[in-house]
UniProtKB/Swiss-Prot annotation:
Activated by phosphorylation. Belongs to the phosphohexose mutase family. One of its GO terms (cellular component) is cytosol. Coiled coil: none annotated. This is Phosphoglucosamine mutase. The gene is glmM.
Length: 447
């Protein structure tokens, strides 16, 4: 793969005002994307965004660049990332663009693209866009310029799509649900979906002001949701992230239910209904408890690199329909093309209704193993973990764990840090000591 200057594993991301998250770069990017994606028949591109204040500025720049390349932008206003993937498909648009930095703070922003099928752009297309950025910007003839318009009722269309993934014979009349929208893009979607299906809904963090997205709320910070579920004596709580592609749940006792537990419930039910195609894709960070629980049900499980893009690649390669990251990206290819927090939540409600059990009872079947992560910084070579000494150290730890746990060593993709992760069916203090010993030994072998 070529070295890419701007695109990372999940589009382009950074601090607003610093290159490349600037209005002049976004204008050029809109033009470059338009030039590369142009086909004769369709000149439409859908643009959505989350609730960051900077989204308005960046959207205007992007739409000007697209217009210069002869593309008309269809604007949805604040909408979840998975909604843009869906609308791109239904409008037969050339591409969908989301302006968002997902679970990052408000002063960051970013951009990601979907192709005509609602999937992430291929590496080769991203590289072609980067190459086009090097060329001077030229306008098409005046008569061919694009113009922006709003999609009327984009939210309503997506709400109906979400509801359509829930069995029509079921409703949520007996549920009291707390929903935390992270002051993000699902603020006008998630509460409506749940209310229209009959639930009693208590909404928190559903009042975005451009600056409060992900601030002490949402899927990466569930403290407020846990308190609220207990105070309201709700049946459960759901937390989405700023752009709506992650889901974390909370049971009626205030316990966290993460992506590993959620995907287990959905896969087990699909297996029970004889609708499971293949198995489940997780990541290197998926808890071993998930692997063991799926093993008991004879459901195949494979691990991908961390990142929803890699999970999807593995799913497509093996023909699996269910994949997830423990952080709450749940990909259900029988329902949609990308991770979708709202749709994943509805599938969990379906499992609860079909089994007539609480979320807490359902989760008791999967025992997550205690997991300890020790990080330490290092300087120098990326391949430090490749030595024979470290390989034999890993073997030693694995024999200590005797098949009831695992050790993972990896260097961070974003900072000079080595991560030592150990999880095992053991007391937490035993694992912590073991992880710290391993970290010390690696440090010694480096210097």
């Amino acid at each position: 793969m070529h070295h890419r200057k701007y695109f990372g594993t999940d589009g382009i991301r950074g601090k607003v005002g610093d290159m490349p998250i600037t209005p002049d770069f976004f204008l050029k990017l809109g033009w470059a994307a338009g030039k590369i994606l142009a086909r004769q028949d369709s000149r439409k591109i859908i643009i959505g965004k989350d609730t960051r204040i900077s989204g308005y500025m960046l959207e205007s720049a992007l739409e000007a660049g697209l217009a210069a390349a002869g593309f008309s932008a269809l604007l949805t206003g604040p909408m979840p990332t998975p909604a843009i993937a869906y609308l791109t498909r239904t409008f037969r648009a050339e591409a969908g663009i989301v302006i968002s930095a997902s679970h990052n703070p408000f002063y960051d922003n970013g951009i990601k693209f979907f192709d005509i099928n609602g999937s992430k752009l291929s590496d080769s297309l991203e590289e072609a866009i980067e190459a086009q950025l090097e060329k001077p910007l030229t306008c098409v003839e005046s008569a061919q310029l694009g113009k922006a318009r709003r999609i009327v009722d984009a939210a309503g269309r997506y709400i109906e799509f979400c509801k359509g993934t829930f069995p029509s014979e079921f409703n949520l009349k007996n549920f009291k649900i707390v929903v935390d929208c992270s002051n993000g893009a699902t603020y006008h979607i998630a509460p409506s979906v749940l209310k229209e299906l009959g639930a009693t809904v208590i909404s928190i963090a559903c009042e975005p002001n451009g600056l409060n997205i992900n601030k002490e709320c949402g899927a990466t910070n569930i403290g407020m949701l846990q308190k609220s579920v207990l105070a309201e004596q709700a049946d459960l709580g759901i937390a989405l992230d700023g752009d709506g592609d992650r889901l974390i749940m909370v049971d009626h006792l205030g316990n966290k239910v993460d992506g590993d537990q959620i995907v287990y419930l959905i896969a087990k039910e699909a297996c029970r209904q004889q609708q499971l195609k293949g198995g489940v894709v997780g990541t290197l960070m998926s808890n071993m408890g998930l692997e063991l629980a799926l093993q008991r049900l004879k459901i195949p499980f494979i691990r991908a690199k961390v990142g929803d893009r890699y999970v999807l690649e593995k799913m497509q390669k093996h023909g699996y329909r269910i994949g997830a990251e423990n952080s709450g990206h749940i990909i259900l290819l029988d329902k949609t093309t990308t991770g979708d927090g709202m749709i994943a939540a509805l599938q969990v409600f379906k499992v609860i209704i079909q089994n007539q059990m609480t979320l807490h009872e359902l989760c008791s079947e999967i025992k997550l193993l205690p997991q300890v992560l020790v990080n330490f910084s290092f300087s120098g070579n990326k391949n430090v973990l490749q030595s024979d000494a470290i390989a034999s150290l890993v073997k030693k730890v694995e024999s200590t764990l005797a098949g009831r746990g695992r050790i993972l060593l990896r260097t961070s993709g974003t900072e000079p840090v080595i991560r030592v992760m150990i999880e095992a069916d053991q007391e937490e203090h035993f694992i912590k000591t073991l992880a710290e010993e391993v970290a010390e030994k690696i440090k010694k072998s480096l210097y």
